[in-house]
Amino acid sequence: MTLCILTASQKSHALTAHTINIIVGSKPKVVDITAAAKKHGFILNGVFYSSSTHNLSDTNINEFDGFTKLSDFIIKNYTANDLDNSSNYDDAEGDSISHSQPFAVGQTIYQWFDNNGIRIADSDKLNIIGCGSGYAMPLTLTITTSVKTYSEYGNPNESEAVAITKLYKIASKSKLCYAKPYSTESKSGYQWVGINSADGYNWNDPNFSQPNPNNGGGYSVDYVPNWGYKANPAASSGKIFPTTGFSGAKFQLVMTGAQTDYEFSIPVNPGGNVSVDDQGYITLNDKPTGAVTINAKLIRDNNIVHQYTFDVTRMWVVPHNGKYTYDQAVQICNGQDNMLTMADLSNSPRSYDYYNLTSADHISNSYTRKIGDSVFGEWGWVTKNSYPDSNWREDPIDTATFSGRYWTKEINKTDSQWGFVVHSHDGYVVSYSFRLIGSMYNSSYANVVCKK
């Protein structure tokens, strides 16, 4: 066995197995960590992204489609092939890198954090990063691997473990996604209804998402369960939610990421009757005098401003407390012309076929969640409970005492002692006697809602 101690001037000379068997000195080192870390990355939609491949920035925010799930980012396992035997190895005594095992690479570990430094749990990995995710942007993806290197002849020949870590800033592309009626949140279990074969009601049942031509129910393609209406609807003939309104009506503009990533304001507010808070909740306090525009400015980039314009001047309604006869309703509304039609309140098929209310296929009925053609169809379950700042009736204790029945202006042509009411929670349209004919539903008395 030969012991060779090199001076600094000798370090540059090549050492081979012919001249030395063991070199006693310092440990070898893994070097140029910054360059090595650039090879950390992920595969998304079949494309490998990393700093080293120049399609992923390590200094700027990288934006991806908001419908991308965290689980769609397939983190690449770091291997010895990602290290260079020359540039990532150093030995103070000039010993060469081991031929049999140049590097030992540990497990690749990654974590996601939101912009507040809160770690995103593994159970959330199936969540999308965009619309309504609630994640403060940008996210930070941290990828790390422990690496050691080995010299050919050194004693010791194993380096200290070095962490090769890379951080990438990931964000969803900024977007205004949905306009969510407050009832979607406050009465989330009662967003849409379907009429089953037993003439009963099924709430939030996916089997009844399609509107029935005889009974109504379901929702249009513009309504997304749990999120509300699409900000850019496709089936509303260009109408934007809401097109109807009442004092205390409330909805939220749902953005990509966290609501706190945006600053909300109202640059156009004719009449000054609309307000917005820092979470993007818009409240209609009274009837605007024209179209209202809301701005949502991305705080991290003030050049990105989303605008949302709506107009509720076409149909503004005013509900009144108490139960009244039809004649009293006419007086409260200052005339029959200021009362609402069935079709104004509900887009149930019965609203357009109200003289056929007792046919076999026209028993139970309800609204369809849709933009543009009725108050209850747009706003959903409409009571004081679902819109706390409104003047609608409260939810009932039980069905028999339900008080949210609102007179419409129509009178039955074949029997002038019968009118019609619409239920505010489900859009149910039914004929209603002007005379007291029973105690269960307290016929002859109903609630009043007027136009403004």
Listing of model-derived features with the role each one plays in the protein:
Residues 3, 7-276, 285:
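Acidic, serine/threonine- and proline/glycine-rich low-complexity repeats
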Residues 109-116, 299, 411, 452:
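Short, flexible beta-strand-to-coil junctions
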Residues 117, 162-164, 318-322, 436-437:
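Short, intrinsically disordered, charge-biased short linear motifs at domain edges
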Residues 189-196, 200, 204-211, 219, ...:
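Short, structured beta-strand segments at or near domain termini in extracellular proteins/domains
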Residues 227-265, 269-345:
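Extracellular adhesion/carbohydrate-recognition regions
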Residues 316-408:
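Conserved hydrophobic ligand-interaction patch in extracellular adhesion modules
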Residues 375-452:
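Extracellular C-type lectin-like domains
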